[in-house]
Amino acid sequence: MRIAIFGSCVSRDTCEFIPNSNVVEYVARQSVTSLSLPRRQPDLDLGVLSSEFQKRMVASDLEGSGAKRIVDRAEDIDVVLLDLVDERRGFWQFTDGTRVTNSMEAEACGVRELATKSGAHLVEFGTDEHYSHWVRGFNSLFASLATAGLADKTVFLDIEWAGALEGANHPQGDMVGLLGRRLRRVKRGARDATRSLINGAGAHESWTRLKNVKATEAELFADRAAESNRLYTRYRKTVHSIVARAVSRQSHEVRIGREHRWGPEPFHYRDQDYNSIVKDLLVQLGKSEG
């Protein structure tokens, strides 16, 4: 199966589990907002990036060439996978109207410093400003795919961020669950404060320890996933209204893969999750496994 991707790790990692798959075009680290008004100026230092892949992705974002790269390969493509992971960091809006995706790679190349000097501002994901620009960008992307005859070959991977690590229960999102997490943090703080008093710390230091309890890794993942899934809601609904085919998973249905090749993150899942996604993807495409 010949695959094109406009997205990031959710789609790319899924491809590793698709039988006989071949990724012929991969557009990553690029928000759809930069398609219409890309920077088109060589004012970022791509030389600081050690990976040729990273350099190509930032260069593509600066050129706004993501849609064209896929359309130019239309005859070689069996399926186009879309996901929204790379929208999560927002984009830089420059005073001349141009935009740069706020990827980690672009930041390493100096986009933040350039933006500060140029009077640009960061348009954060989830804001009304971001959403309005994103809607126009996504409509433009899908129109390009449709014109190239790829609309029926496009599948949206609508996979919510996982709120729990592999082997753990999904965190409760109601008030009882929230109060339970807060109570556990208070108990950890109390134990830490008690130990500090026993070890000779003063009352002020112990009180500070009690107040400033660090969240556990699991709690941080749960909080990040809950907030991101909330912000993604209207974006996902919009994609579903435009793209006919989709594979969806809610947060409670997936888990963070502890042994994921790129490390544990709410958008890095277990092998069994990817296998399940692939099974549904093949059904969407009218194909059987194998």
Residue ranges and their predicted role:
Residues 1-290:
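Extracellular glycan-modifying ectodomains
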